[in-house]
Amino acid sequence: VTTSTDHGRSDLESSSLALTRDGRSVSDRGDTVCVIGAGASGLTAIKNLTEHGFGVDCYERETGVGGAWNWRHDRSPVYASTHLISSRPFTQFPDFPMPDDWPDYPHHSQLLSYLERYAEHFDLRRHVWFGTEVVRVEPADGDRWDVTTRSTGGYGPERTSRYAAVVIANGHNWSPKLPDYEGLAEFRGEAMHASSYQDPAQLRGKRVLVVGAGNTGCDIAVEAAQQASRCWHATRRSYWYAPKYVLGRPVDQINDVLLALRVPRRVRQWLYHLTLRLTVGDLTRFGLARPDHRMLETHPIVNSQLVHYLGHGRVTPVPDPVRFHPHSVELADGRRIDPELVVFATGYLPRFDFLDPKILGDDGTVGRPVLWLNAFAPNHPTLAVAGLVQPDSGMFPLSHWQTVLFARLLRSRVTRPGRAAGFAAAVVARAGERYAGPVRDSSRHWFEVGHVDYLRALQRALHDLEAK
């Protein structure tokens, strides 16, 4: 197990001993903050907390930084061809730009390199215990937290440490949302979730059914069009497929100009519909149903190639499956198809197995946390979740400002307790607020945010916390 050199000293040097509420021994880490996960959100949490004067212990179950972007990790959802769908300027951290000579949409290997250089530049690895998983996070007296860890895989003894605060940054794109189709267990072909997809060679020469029309599903359908003997693409509803470039610029940069000009949502929707009409035309002629929603009412699907392969007959759109048979799949329109391989690109669900779900406002039946700013839990002022957002553009800047806000909140609890109390009251009153226009009610959109609206909300919270 690789641990931080800063934490290599003995408990007697670095901690005092206490007891948990049920009598277990615990090492008290004083004012140190615990960060769970060393992906993009965890790394920026470490940086911002240390820059505000806090000690940090970060626990990472894998052997390196990068989280979802580290393809070597068994929980990483990336596959060989994964690229950003948000452009470089909107994805980079505000205080650590990506190289100017990188492409508009960097490859996942470049993203991992970027995060590794970020960790190196800010000397973050010395705060990380690698190969260590968190098994329990429990409230302790005085708004503190008892965090129990062990070596990844369950080897060795458990260890409990007490922290002044906790940042959860374990990601929300690693636990597959698995479908429950009738007869699936009887299917004699191969079936897998997109989390197990890595390389187009898995599709080569096969009859492939891709289920799901998110960005991953569209990417895999395109690769099946290139490699498989036949590809069906099943979707529950039709979507609007946005090109990656409009007027020669990445589409999110065009969108940002409209947002900066405060163009009304209805006008932006009209402009997007006009753009799609001029660029890809009416997709119903390829066999797709007309979408039952307007642009901006679902998470953006950004793919310039799917329409190309629909038009060339290499992808056949079909409705959602309703039942699996041993050698065929029955579709909602009554047709049957005979895929050899089914790939379920049905998304992911958040998991916080180490924490009582009620702490995050979930009653345990839905699995959806109820937080303010998608980060702060009512009645738990020293707990934050970083990166639990699904933005319409880049993610890293949002995690950066989330963790800046949390660091300043922790500092205010000492220097300006009245402001901190006002913040805590706002968390209780405003938990569950949304930061996007009307979107479809589905688990896919639980954490949907418009990046401009969300950044403005974070800026207002920072201003209110620090105003004189």
Show where each model-derived region lies.
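Active-site segment of extracytoplasmic enzymes that catalyze sulfate/phosphate-ester chemistry
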Residues: 90-91
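Short, mixed-charge aromatic SLiMs
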Residues: 425-439
